[in-house]
C-alpha cells in the first residue's frame, strides 16, 4: 500500500474572479483593524453568495455594481425560496445585505470605485422577536438544584450555572473566563473580549460567589491535570468550550423536566426578566448584558406576560368592578351565573 500523500487543498472556484480578490483585500483590512475571524467568516459567506450571483449575470468588476444591481439582488433575496419552499426571513435578508454595504463603503474609501452604490440601499427592517420561552424563578431554581455538589463535576456545574444566572453572561463569555477574572472581594467578574470584542465588568451575586469558592477549593483541583488559566475546566482538565457550557445547561434542564427551547441563553433571558420585574432599570440591564444599543435590551420590557397579567388583574378598574359585582349580596347560584356571563362576554 502506498503511503498517503499530502492532502490537496480544495481549489476555490471563485479565486480567479476580480470581485473575489477585492473581497479578500477587504477582509484582510478588517482583520488588521481588529475584527474577529468569526465576523469575517460570516461576512465571507454573504459576499461570496453575492459574487456567485454577479458571475451568473456577467458582472465582473466592482465598478459594474450599481445601485440598480444591488436592488435587483435585494429583490432576488426577497423572492428566493429554500428547498422546502420557505422564503428567507427578514433577518436572513438583512444579514446577506449588510456585509455588502460595508464592503462597498470600503471599496469607495480606498478609491477602488468612484462612488459607493450601496450608500442609499435600504436594508430590511429587522423584526423584534420576543424570546421564545422564559424560565420562571422556580424553574431556574429547579435547574440549579439538579447539579450534584457531592461530585467534582457536579460542583463545577453548579458554580457555572449560578454564575450564568447571576451575571447573565453569554456561554462564550463564561467559557473565556480566567481564574483572575473573578474578584471575590469586590464581587465582580471581568468579561474580556465579549461580543463585539468588547470588555465589561459585571457584578456577581453573593450566592454565586459562594458556589464559585467551593468549586475552586474542592472541585477544580481534582479536575485539572495541568496548570490552566481557565476558570472552568472539563472532566478531563481542559478549558470548557461554549458548546460544552450549553450542553451542561441543557442536561440539567432535561433532568428538571423543563422542555423549553434553548439553554444558556434561557438563563440570560431569565436573569434580565427577573431583575426587570424586581424594579431594575433597563439601562442597568443594558450595561450588564453588554448590549450596544438600548433597543436590544428593551425587548425584555415586553416579555413578562404573567407579571403584566398579575398587575393588570390587581389594578385595572374594570377588573375591580367585576370583583365588586361578584362579591355583592346574592345567592351562590346567582353569583356563579353572573360570573359565567361575564366570562362569556370577555371571550
UniProtKB/Swiss-Prot annotation:
This is Tyrosine recombinase XerC 2. GO terms for molecular function: DNA binding. Pfam families: Phage_int_SAM_4, Phage_integrase. The active site is at 170, 195, 265, 268, 291, 300 (o-(3'-phospho-dna)-tyrosine intermediate). PROSITE patterns: CB (PS51900), TYR_RECOMBINASE (PS51898). It is found in: Cytoplasm. InterPro entries: CB, DNA_brk_join_enz, Integrase-like_cat_sf, Integrase_catalytic, Integrase_recombinase_N, Integrase_SAM-like_N, Tyrosine_recombinase_XerCD. GO terms for biological process: cell division; chromosome segregation; DNA integration; DNA recombination. Belongs to the 'phage' integrase family. Transmembrane segments: none annotated. Residues 17-108 form the Core-binding (CB) domain. The keyword DNA-binding applies.
Amino acid at each position: 500500500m502506498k503511503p498517503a500523500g499530502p492532502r490537496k487543498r480544495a481549489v476555490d472556484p471563485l479565486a480567479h474572479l476580480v470581485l473575489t480578490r477585492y473581497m479578500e483585500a477587504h477582509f484582510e483590512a478588517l482583520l488588521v483593524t481588529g475584527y474577529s475571524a468569526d465576523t469575517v467568516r460570516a461576512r465571507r459567506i454573504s459576499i461570496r453568495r453575492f459574487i456567485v450571483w454577479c458571475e451568473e449575470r456577467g458582472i465582473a468588476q466592482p465598478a459594474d455594481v450599481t445601485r440598480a444591481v444591488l436592488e435587483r439582488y435585494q429583490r432576488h433575496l426577497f423572492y428566493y425560496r429554500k428547498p422546502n419552499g420557505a422564503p428567507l426571513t427578514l433577518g436572513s435578508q438583512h444579514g446577506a445585505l449588510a456585509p455588502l454595504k460595508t464592503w462597498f463603503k470600503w471599496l469607495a474609501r480606498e478609491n477602488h470605485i468612484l462612488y459607493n452604490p450601496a450608500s442609499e440601499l435600504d436594508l430590511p427592517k429587522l423584526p423584534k422577536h420576543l424570546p421564545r420561552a422564559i424560565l420562571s424563578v422556580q424553574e431556574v431554581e429547579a435547574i440549579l438544584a439538579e447539579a450534584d455538589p457531592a461530585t467534582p463535576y457536579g460542583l463545577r456545574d453548579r458554580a457555572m450555572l449560578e454564575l450564568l444566572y447571576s451575571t447573565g453572561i453569554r456561554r462564550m463569555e463564561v467559557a473565556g473566563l480566567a481564574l483572575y477574572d473573578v474578584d471575590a472581594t469586590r464581587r465582580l467578574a471581568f468579561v474580556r473580549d465579549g461580543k463585539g470584542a468588547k470588555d465589561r465588568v459585571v457584578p456577581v451575586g453573593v450566592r454565586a460567589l459562594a458556589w464559585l469558592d467551593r468549586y475552586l477549593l474542592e472541585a477544580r483541583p481534582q479536575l485539572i491535570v495541568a496548570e490552566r488559566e481557565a476558570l472552568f475546566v472539563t472532566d478531563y482538565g481542559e478549558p470548557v468550550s461554549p458548546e460544552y457550557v450549553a450542553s451542561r445547561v441543557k442536561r440539567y434542564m432535561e433532568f428538571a423536566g423543563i422542555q423549553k427551547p434553548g439553554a444558556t441563553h434561557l438563563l440570560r433571558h431569565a436573569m434580565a426578566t427577573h431583575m426587570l420585574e424586581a424594579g431594575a432599570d433597563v439601562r442597568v440591564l443594558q450595561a450588564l448584558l453588554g448590549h450596544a444599543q438600548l433597543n436590544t435590551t428593551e425587548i425584555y420590557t415586553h416579555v413578562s406576560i404573567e407579571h403584566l397579567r398579575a398587575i393588570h388583574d390587581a389594578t385595572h378598574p374594570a377588573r375591580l368592578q367585576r370583583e365588586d359585582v361578584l362579591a355583592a349580596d346574592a345567592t351562590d347560584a346567582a353569583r356563579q351565573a353572573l360570573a359565567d356571563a361575564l366570562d362569556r362576554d370577555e371571550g
